[in-house]
Amino acid sequence: MNTPIPAQDIRPEPAATHRSGILALDLGTTTGWALRSHDGLITSGTASFRPGRFDGGGMRYLRFTNWLTELDRLSGPIAAIWFEEVRRHAGTDAAHIYGGLMATLTSWAELRGI
């Protein structure tokens, strides 16, 4: 028996994104980002989360969390976050970094209801 599965509409509510920001991310040690703020202005750039010489293993993720919080504070509330879900990485280190950044991003967004 073939039961059709209804497709889910994963787009954010239009009213929510019209008055709030949308953030797009390319996760990695050097994270690419683009932000459409609540007033329609689009800005983009990169942010480096490369650990320093004397940093502990979790400092990269703490800096990423602080960067997200500051971006949210300065740009107005973020209503939606879009990012690519990578299925395969060439190296083990890249996979671990991506997994840590994605876990940090999803927990940060869940805490804020994004």
Language-model region placement:
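Phosphate- and other anionic-substrate recognition elements at nucleic-acid/protein interfaces
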Residues: 1-114
